Amino acid sequence: MPVDQEKLAKLHKLSAANKVGGTRRKINKKGNLYNNNDKDNTKLQAELHKLHPMTIENVAEANFFKKNGKVLHFNSAVVQIAPQCNLTMIHGQPKENTLNGLYPSVASQLGSQELEYLTGLAHNLENEQTVLDQLGDRCSETKQQVMNS
């Protein structure tokens, strides 16, 4: 049976004008506007409570030294320990600082061994930084040579 193209085009035009069904618009899903991890935090607190930690009182500040030379500094931190699990917990909002920035305020609170260790760590970081700077200079020189040739 032959199909008349004019009638078919006319039917397509009419069917486009008379759509059946509702509009299929997307419903905008709003994400969590306040990204708080209270659910995860309560689970974590429940698990930590099972360890029966002891709270250490009167801790004014705590510092956590990283290998990359950064220091996590906690003001008015809550420190808990669970000696049976060899676990120490520090609760609070940390600020990430450099070792050189905290060194003057921390130096008076440290013993001789810790002071020597931090001094050595600071010197190692400075040496690494100078080596990285030298490598960066060499790389920029080679890039310029390649571009010039």
Swiss-Prot record:
GO terms for biological process: 'de novo' cotranslational protein folding; cotranslational protein targeting to membrane; protein transport. The keyword Transcription regulation applies. Keywords: Cytoplasm, Nucleus, Protein transport, Transcription, Transcription regulation, Transport. It is found in: Cytoplasm; Nucleus. It comes from the Eukaryota. Part of the nascent polypeptide-associated complex (NAC), consisting of EGD2 and either EGD1 or BTT1. NAC associates with ribosomes via EGD1 or BTT1. Present with 1820 molecules/cell in log phase SD medium. This is Nascent polypeptide-associated complex subunit beta-2. It comes from Saccharomyces cerevisiae (strain ATCC 204508 / S288c) (Baker's yeast).
